[in-house]
């Protein structure tokens, strides 16, 4: 079996890559990964060097896996700073490291694409052997698989990788017919408070959901602007995604994108106030980014959670992943679920820790 290292996802055709993963999960689509690279969001300069893997058998591609060589731990949402600090304290280099993940995207999904009829255990054995060899070649301390589906951790990898468990809060669709049907499952006081929040959040404000081609260029420009403002306010940076990403993502994955938006309530259309960006597939909705140009009470909950729940019910989606963290989501019908990561540490003293 031959391994090929792709310095860019575009060294593999979109038809081949997407056929190996055979899923409508949006974040592993060739177009999404390609745009991260071509927009300058993911590149050497941002500390995400593409090293994607393609496995071939007798010249026929049979498996693929996203892989990055990284010199930091930002944009991962699985925190390993304590490991990095421990390495530093012992005078050992932790970076670079190898990461199999979707950059900036803590969303559970497939991480290895395998052609039909190929034994997954065989692919995992070959990948693990090659990862160890590549880590030595590139001086990488470790390999990290972030937010894989649970099955991946119970096969070959369970013998060589450490598993870590985290918690997110997801909403599950129990065949609700509409939002009222959903809130009817709440205790009376809880339901009353939530509906009061919704009314308060839309006083003098129009809230809408836009899908695909309904999202105009000016809304993409606004989403980009408030995304950067949100990060600037939070940590003094402009965030991970560039303006070009927002300019082009609608053309790349438009049919799998929903934007919930808020405007001032005025005849002829008011000023844009806030927006939240979601992706979706046949099974779930994934809330990713939010931003606003002023503070409005409860508007974040309306655009990021309630609009997402309504959309999921309308589309008959099974679940809604509204993003990392947030125990406050429980009061809005979200439940805690386990999320996973797996880690191979080359240094024996640390791998046994």
Q: Residue ranges of each PLM-predicted region?
A:
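Conserved acetyl-CoA-binding loop-helix of GNAT-fold acetyltransferases
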Residues: 94, 119-132, 295-310, 321
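A conserved beta-strand-loop-helix scaffold within acyl/acetyltransferase catalytic domains
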Residues: 1-93, 132-297
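Conserved GNAT acetyl-CoA-binding A-motif
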Residues: 138-147, 312-324
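A short, internal acetyl-CoA/4′-phosphopantetheine-binding micro-motif in the GNAT/acyltransferase core
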Residues: 107-120, 290-298
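Short glycine/proline-enriched loop/turn "hinge" motifs that connect secondary-structure elements
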Residues: 94-106, 279
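Active-site/acyl-donor-binding loops of N-acyltransferases
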Residues: 10, 69, 109, 156-186, ...
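Hydrophobic/aromatic ligand-binding patch that stacks against planar heteroaromatic rings
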Residues: 134, 311, 328
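Extended, hydrophobic alpha-helical segments in both membrane/secreted and soluble proteins
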Residues: 223, 245, 272, 287, ...
């Amino acid at each position: 079996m031959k391994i090929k290292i792709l310095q860019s996802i575009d060294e593999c055709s979109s038809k081949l890559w997407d056929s190996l993963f055979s899923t409508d999960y949006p974040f592993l689509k060739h177009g999404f990964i390609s745009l991260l690279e071509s927009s300058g969001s993911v590149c050497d300069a941002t500390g995400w060097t593409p090293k994607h893997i393609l496995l071939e058998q007798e010249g026929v591609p049979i498996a693929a896996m996203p892989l990055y060589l990284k010199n930091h731990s930002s944009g991962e949402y699985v925190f390993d700073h304590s490991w990095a600090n421990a390495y530093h304290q012992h005078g050992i280099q932790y970076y670079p490291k190898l990461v199999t993940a979707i950059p900036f995207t803590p969303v559970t999904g497939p991480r290895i694409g395998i052609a039909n009829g190929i034994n997954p255990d065989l692919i995992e054995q070959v990948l693990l052997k090659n990862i160890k060899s590549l880590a030595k070649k590139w001086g990488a301390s470790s390999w990290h698989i972030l937010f894989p589906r649970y099955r991946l951790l119970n096969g070959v990898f369970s013998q060589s990788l450490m598993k870590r468990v985290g918690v997110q809060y997801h909403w599950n669709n129990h065949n609700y017919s509409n939002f009222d049907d959903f809130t009817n499952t709440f205790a009376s006081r809880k339901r009353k408070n939530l509906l009061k929040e919704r009314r308060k959040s839309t006083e003098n404000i129009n809230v809408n959901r836009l899908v695909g081609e309904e999202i105009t260029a000016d809304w993409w420009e606004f989403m980009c602007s408030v995304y950067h403002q949100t990060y600037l306010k939070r940590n003094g940076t402009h965030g991970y995604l560039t303006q070009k990403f927002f300019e082009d993502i609608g053309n790349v994955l438009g049919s799998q994108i929903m934007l919930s938006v808020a405007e001032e309530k005025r005849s002829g259309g008011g000023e844009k106030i806030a927006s939240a960006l979601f992706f979706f597939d046949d099974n779930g909705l994934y809330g990713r980014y939010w931003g606003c140009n002023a503070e409005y009470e409860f508007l974040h909950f309306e655009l990021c959670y309630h609009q997402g729940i309504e959309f999921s019910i309308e589309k008959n989606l099974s679940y809604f992943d509204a993003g990392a963290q947030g125990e406050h989501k429980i009061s809005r019908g979200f439940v805690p679920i386990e999320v996973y990561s797996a880690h191979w540490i080359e240094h024996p003293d640390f791998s046994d820790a």
